[in-house]
């Protein structure tokens, strides 16, 4: 069945509290999607953001972002008083997230709620913690220690804690018991609210498309507590890190800095770490997009400490062995393979063997001639997701205004429009009319916004992940 949807992260929802929440605005957005006959809401990773604010560099692959917790719901439950969160400065620009300001105040507010919660815990709380024991205890301890160490990365902690020594861990669990309970409470409330929102969306016939990065952050609870799954030395330093080689767009390549996986160990363990991760994601979302899918066939390794990605090398990944195990243990999980970037015949073979739909990004279609594989008349399968652009792209209006005259002219001729301002909606129509089973447009392209609304510019920090929809007024049109 053909369907379409909108790409907009939770952080971009409007409200008065600095960043999008799982509250009434999220439900209103679901109502908008239903009214607009959309069937999908695609979001970015929902994990807690760390330094740089990227949802793709998180302290945990399992935890939800505390920033998204609906404070009004906590008030209704009796855990907050209005003045305790409404009289706080959350940022002075409704169109942009001030992550620094939110970090300053959100945990004080949530700790206030936790104090009241502890006086009369909900019965479902203990059940939630037990059901998530495989990750939540270590995550709660990790966050407790991080705050106790004034935000320092785990590899800068005292040696016994850094090395996850059993005696030190046991002592820390006792010392930080109250803090651990707080971080468990935060996750309990997050997932309680998330499940209600997802159920509401599903009732309206809308699927949530989630996103998981292929790699995890070095400063994460997973690398700290389960180093055996990663390519680390005896001091828990990465041997090599992830990235991409130089190409026509980046002379130095891309140095992501994430530790790489110890695929030999993971394979011996029947890929349990990855199977559990995909299982958790499939329980959280209806469909799971896996970022940098080609990295499972072969991945680029850069020596730890290198200043750029020039001296890296390719190594073979687990390929279909992983996804055969996923299918064996989990059945047919709905997965989207982010297959953008440097693709070889081996990557294409893996994608075809998996049966997962890949991605077609229209913005990539106009930089050569009419044989470009991202132009709809060259699409060879319906088993793909067509996008106007992704979170890493310029908005369509920003792109058409910045590209060279030859590309601009070719694009307008292809779309049959005469002005730059007409291109975004023409591109949306092109996306919708492709043969792909699913078509997704960025909200910024639906609203014909320029690059001031761009979500992310890869390999840069500072101005990313900030864009917000100021209100739903424009959607009424």
Feature locations, PLM:
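Alpha-amylase-like alpha-glycosidases and glucanotransferases acting on alpha-linked glucans and related
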Residues: 9, 15, 53-191, 216-440, ...
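Glycan-recognition and catalytic regions of carbohydrate-active enzymes
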Residues: 448-451
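Conserved, well-ordered alpha-helix/loop/beta-strand core segments that scaffold catalytic motifs
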Residues: 183-216
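Catalytic domains of carbohydrate-active enzymes, especially glycoside hydrolases
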Residues: 24-49, 284-285, 431-433
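Outer-envelope exported proteins of Gram-negative bacteria
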Residues: 44, 207-209, 213, 287, ...
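Surface-exposed amphipathic alpha-helices with a cationic face
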Residues: 34, 194-202, 327, 351-352
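N-terminal regions that are enriched for targeting/export leaders
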Residues: 1-11, 27
């Amino acid at each position: 069945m053909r369907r379409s949807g909108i790409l907009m992260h939770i952080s971009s929802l409007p409200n008065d509290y600095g960043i999008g929440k799982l509250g009434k605005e999220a439900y209103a957005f679901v109502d908008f999607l239903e009214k607009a006959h959309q069937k999908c809401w695609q979001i970015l990773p929902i994990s807690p953001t760390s330094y740089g604010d990227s949802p793709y560099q998180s302290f945990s692959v399992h935890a939800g972002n505390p920033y998204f917790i609906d404070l009004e719901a906590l008030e209704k439950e009796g855990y907050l008083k209005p003045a305790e969160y409404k009289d706080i400065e959350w940022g002075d620009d409704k169109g942009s997230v001030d992550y620094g300001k939110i970090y300053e105040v959100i945990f004080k507010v949530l700790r206030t709620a936790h104090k009241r919660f502890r006086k009369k815990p909900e019965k479902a709380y203990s059940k939630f913690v037990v059901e998530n024991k495989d990750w939540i205890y270590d995550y709660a301890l990790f966050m407790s220690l991080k705050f106790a160490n004034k935000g320092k990365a785990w590899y800068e902690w005292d040696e016994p804690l850094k090395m996850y020594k059993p005696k030190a861990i046991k002592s820390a669990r006792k010392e930080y018991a109250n803090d651990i309970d707080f971080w468990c409470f935060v996750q309990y409330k997050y997932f309680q609210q998330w499940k209600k929102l997802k159920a509401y969306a599903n009732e309206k016939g809308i699927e949530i498309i989630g996103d998981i990065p292929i790699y995890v952050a070095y400063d994460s609870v997973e690398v700290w507590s389960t180093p055996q799954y990663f390519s680390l030395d005896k001091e828990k330093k990465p041997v090599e890190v992830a990235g991409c080689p130089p190409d026509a767009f980046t002379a130095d390549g891309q140095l992501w800095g994430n530790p790489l996986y110890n695929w030999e160990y993971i394979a011996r363990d029947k890929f349990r770490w990855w199977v559990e991760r995909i299982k958790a994601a499939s329980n959280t979302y209806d469909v799971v997009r896996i970022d940098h899918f080609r990295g499972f066939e072969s991945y680029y390794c850069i020596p730890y400490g290198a200043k750029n990605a020039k001296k890296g090398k390719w190594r073979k990944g687990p390929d279909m062995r992983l996804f055969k195990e996923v299918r064996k243990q989990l059945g047919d999980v709905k997965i989207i393979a982010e297959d953008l970037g440097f693709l070889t015949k081996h990557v294409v073979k893996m994608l075809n063997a998996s049966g997962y739909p890949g991605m077609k990004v229209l913005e990539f279609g106009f930089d050569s001639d009419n044989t470009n594989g991202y132009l709809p008349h060259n699409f060879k399968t319906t088993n793909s997701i067509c996008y106007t652009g992704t979170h890493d792209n310029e908005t369509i209006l920003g792109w058409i205004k910045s590209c060279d005259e030859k590309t601009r002219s070719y694009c307008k001729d292809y779309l049959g429009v005469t002005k730059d301002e007409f291109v975004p909606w023409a591109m949306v129509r092109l996306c919708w009319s492709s043969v792909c089973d699913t078509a997704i447009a960025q909200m910024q392209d639906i609203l014909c916004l320029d690059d001031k609304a761009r979500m992310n510019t890869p390999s840069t920090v500072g101005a990313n992940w900030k864009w917000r929809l100021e209100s739903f007024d424009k959607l009424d049109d």
